Amino acid sequence: MEVQTQALTLWAKSGDPFHPLLAHMLDTAAVAWAILEREPGRTRKLYATDWNLGEKEALPWVAFLAGLHDLGKASPVFQAAWDEGAKRVWDAGLTWDEELVREQWVAHGVFTELYVKDVLKRHGLPLRLADPLAKGLGAHHGFLAQGEELKTARLHVKSEASTWQEVRDHLALRLAQSLGLNLPLVLPVEDAEAPAILRVMALASFADWIASDPRFFPYGRDPEALEYWQDALELARKALEDLPWPRVSPRGVRRFEELFPFSPNPLQSSVPELLEKTPGDSVLLLVEAPMGLGKTEAALYASHLLRERLDHRGLYVALPTQATANGLFNRIREFLERLSGGERWELQLQHGAALLNPQYAELLERARPMEVYDLELERNPGQESGGVAASTWFSAKKRAMLAGHGVGTLDQALLGVLKVKHHFIRLWGLMNRVVVLDEVHAYDTYTSGLLKSLLLWLRALGSSVILMTATLPKKKREELLSAWGVGGVELPPYPRVAAFSGGGLLGARHVPLEEKTLHLQGAPTEVSQVAEALKEQLPGALGAIVNTVDRAQALYQALGEGERLTLDELLDSFGAGPNQGAWPGLWEIREEKGRWVVGKRLKDGTLVFLLHARFPAEERALREAVTLALFGKHGPRPEKAILVATQVAEQSLDLDFDLLYSDLAPVDLLFQRAGRLHRHTRKRPEGHQTPVLLVGGLTDEPEFGRELHWNRVYEDYVLLSTWLALQGRETVKVPADLEGLLEEVYERLPEGFPDSLRDRARKSYQNLIDRLQKDASMAGNLSLAELDRLLSQLDASALASDFRLDDEEENASTQRFLTRLGEPSVSVVPLYRRGEEWFLDADGRRPAKMKGDLGKEDVLALWSRAVRLSRFPIPQTLLGEKPPSAWAKSGLLRGLRPLEVGREFPRKELALQVDLDPELGVVYRLV
């Protein structure tokens, strides 16, 4: 039988009719081709430069490589996996060793690596190019092939008849001919650089996802038909239109006032000045300025300028927490609406609880009538096709980074430099993009180490970066700039904006600002005394930010007994309120969540609220919205109210307190918290005309352990140095004093402490240095801290790949490779048992499905109750238990574990009982 006929019997997708392997290879190549057609010209130029080709020559070459991704399916092991298909192949004369195939299974991606290397070499490509390309394409299902897999695969290859190689050669030749690619292959490039390989392996992977969807590429089409390639290309273009794949046209530079409803301040005006002569290379923009000065608007305007001048594909704004991402989401959306000019722009909210955000849910609903991807929904002919929306296809965790625009946590980006499943697709999504990294001072040494690896890759992939910070120690600033390839530059005094490109300084500006005086007062640490100190400061909208959840719960209780306050009661007490900010959104969810507890009302009418990370996700989201509505810029300002919060209120949330209490924290974080004081211009209650920060622990002896546990949250040495720096200081001038205080705290050596504290300082300093070195080393070892590690299997970064870690799963292994170090933790769903049934609520009105098939509503109901816990031994116990069978089938739920409310976890002495309180959230008790 002719090789051509034999090749057509090979199947890629089973069914009746089946989908031939050649057809799928052509479909995938067509998708890759169509994606690059839609991408900005700069993306195509990056692909062309990778191989020293013109854009017209690069397009068929890259599409050809994408089409080869499934060449491993032309193997006996794969073809034998479907009985009907196997018989057809066998009858065509392609046979195999049945015993070997049955007993030695190998994934087809492993065969792809071996076959592609062989095919490329025999068609003229040198080994130095064929080998890395084959490795990258073999990883299209998420991971590089491992040594043992390759060893077994080679046994199979040795047992194959020569006809198999001839068939694979025919497939490659037929693919090349369809694309107009001449063989033998001649590439005018010496080596395949890591960014070039990443661009190919990622494109092949997600082109495969799209080409594998029969709704876009129906089965039954004959790949031998003369018009097959052109038809596949048209199907690919239509599929991308339907998703819709981003297509952002250059629109010309707009003035700041056109995009924001106010004129730029000095900080914001400095951005276009620095970026006026942007070169063709990527840009790093560093914005260092105090809180509340419009850094976000400055960054967004900079992203607009960079996109227009450098032809970037989109924007990703990375923040420290889900709360900060939620807080910025609507502002980013409004900015993009003004910028899009009626064009359809994609915006995804990227973090674990995104579906609970009402603004994001609204964007998903807005997109659905436009989509054909979800066949359960019909197009609405009257629906507008322009504006900002969030498509179903891009809302999946691994695909979200491919969207044109995103707001999310830094973790979502950092996973790109850890070898978790499909990490390279995350990096591709950030390629040729403007990436805003906010609050870069907020990360520990380990996370900062991963951040440096991310900066290395972003520059290599042609992205521009905007680093934003209120306060950044000099050493940390130098490390981040060094990761971008910049060193030895002198910068003007703080506050400042600086731009870098090509390893050098483009320009820098000192930003003169009106000085603000912050008054410091020492405060007690005992919660009952803190509660009394706060109540003495009423009336006013007061805040208290403490260092631990247990302490927040204790302070909330110490403020006194009160009636539970539901959302219904809160809304009724203030009425319709302003039509701005988060307040209108609370009215929209009243019918669904009106009976939910959001706080308490004391006998004297004072409203008390609690916000921390140990509430189930939907309750935390509601409390977050209430907090923003009442303590934000536009809310119905309560006359007497106190918010007790943990670090979730520390960053990016637009809160404005008349007075703030804070536990002692590292100086940079302490003044980050102080940025919530008198944030906006408004009439203040009597006694609150000047901003006052009460600091717990400032007047006491510096004891941060024992029942406080502050030294488990922050380094004892940094707390000690902060405590010393603030002794005797009654005011801080912002911004004049901030940089000096920062350097004093972080550059102080043990010899700079008084005699009474020097021994303790020496010990805690050595502990700090040891841990910093260990964490920095771990980040450097585990991440892609060097570009050449992309395909390496011989360094520590390969460990995540060896464990086959999927960021959608949660088990004991995934805990070793988190984007942030700390105690092990696990996401749980608190459940109530009634007989043999489980419920999400104590009243037994919301069933929790554990078996069978789950609908979308079932999944969302379970997911919305998730809460992450880290108290020993909860994670250690639950991560050893498998999720319920129904949950394991769901990408959203497989990382969760059920937790019966009231369950006791044995320990050496007293057991730990876990309860759920409507006012306090998850509560731990020793029993």
Regions found by a protein language model. Give the residues of each.
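Accessory nucleic-acid engagement/destabilization modules that flank
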Residues: 2-251
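Conserved pre-motif I regulatory segment
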Residues: 251-288
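Walker A/P-loop
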Residues: 280-303, 443-444, 469
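Conserved Walker A/P-loop ATP-binding site and its immediately adjacent core
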Residues: 313-337, 347-358, 472-477, 549
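A substrate-engagement module of RecA-like helicase motors
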Residues: 332-404, 410-414
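Post-DEXD/H (motif II) to motif III coupling segment of the RecA-like Helicase ATP-binding lobe
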Residues: 425-434, 441-507
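C-terminal helicase lobe and adjacent C-terminal extensions/tails of nucleic-acid helicase motors
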Residues: 477, 528-636, 657, 661-927
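Conserved interdomain linker/interface between the two RecA-like ATPase lobes of SF2 helicase motors
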Residues: 487-556
